[in-house]
Amino acid sequence: MFTTDNQLPAVRRRHGPAARILATITAAAAGTLAFTGSGQAAECQDPEALTFAMVPTEETVAELELYKPVTDRMAELTGKKIQFFMPTSYASVVEGMLGGFVQVAVLGPYSYVIASEKDPAVEVFATYAKKPGHMQEEGPGYRAALITKKGSGLTSIESLKGTTLGLVDPGSTSGNLMPRVVFGGVIGMDLDDYFGKVVYTGSHELSSVAVGKGKVDAAFVATHRFDNVVNKGEIKLEDVNVLWQSDPIPQDPFVYRNDLCDELRAKIEETFLGLGDQPEAKAFLENVKSNTFVPMSPSDYDIIRTLKAAKDARKKSG
């Protein structure tokens, strides 16, 4: 379960040609039905191959190679061929899960809640417990942080009125949902009314670098993603002011479709929860700044559901 003991104080389904292509792929990859001992159809999916997808990050290309020991282990434990799907947006991964083309994925907390509300078959089973870093704290949580460039004179929330704000992606938790709902409550108005201009940069890395180069005045970034940018030498912690941080957010959920057969889902869980004991997975765990994966359940993300509901209600009333 997600705890905060060690922590410091809408995507729409697409239609048209792309959707039809995805539907065709889904139909071709559909698994066979498994049967119970009594001979009755259990209506669980047991496909010949599993498609594993991840939300794109600033380190996606490097992660493709680092994930190989993980996908190799999944192939060994499940006896399935593993196909890696690297999309270009949060929405693409969600669409793949909803269409059944993707069976296993890494999502952001907000995109997971969006997907699971559209289809309860999308279910979280694990996440990683992070090591402490420059801004990141130890444990299975992280925070949204509002940063400005040191020396810019932007040292208070009040000083940000009328400036340019960088967000990440409409499907991002720390780079859109938390700022709009929680920080919006702090300032008492919509971000678009408080700031002179609000832009989406596309990634936490780009938001962090944009602040450092003065292309945006302020940005909301995830603490663990900011650490990645520091580790790459593109920015230093002392280069920024941290004006605000959110309460802890559960880390990126690893999800599967729960209409997969029980034994198959158990093997997928074993793939990730046992990585800490696999020497060949050391580089992967180092890359995500973790020693181990921990089990997670849908209720661990109820805080995100509450925030989404508040955002949706505000949108309707507006």
List where the protein language model places each region.
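Sec/Tat signal peptide C-region and signal peptidase I cleavage site
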Residues: 35-41
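An extracytoplasmic/periplasmic, membrane-proximal ligand-sensing/linker region
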Residues: 44-53, 58-69, 75, 249, ...
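Bacterial N-terminal signal peptides
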Residues: 23-34
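A ligand-binding cleft/hinge motif common to bilobed small-molecule-binding domains
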Residues: 106-121, 179-185, 210-213, 217-237
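Short beta-strand->loop
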Residues: 122-139, 194-197, 230-248
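Hydrophobic residues within well-ordered alpha-helices
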Residues: 97-98, 160, 211-212
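N-terminal secretory signal peptides that target proteins for export/translocation
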Residues: 1-17
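Bilobed "Venus flytrap"/periplasmic-binding protein-like clamshell domains
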Residues: 47, 52-76, 87, 110, ...
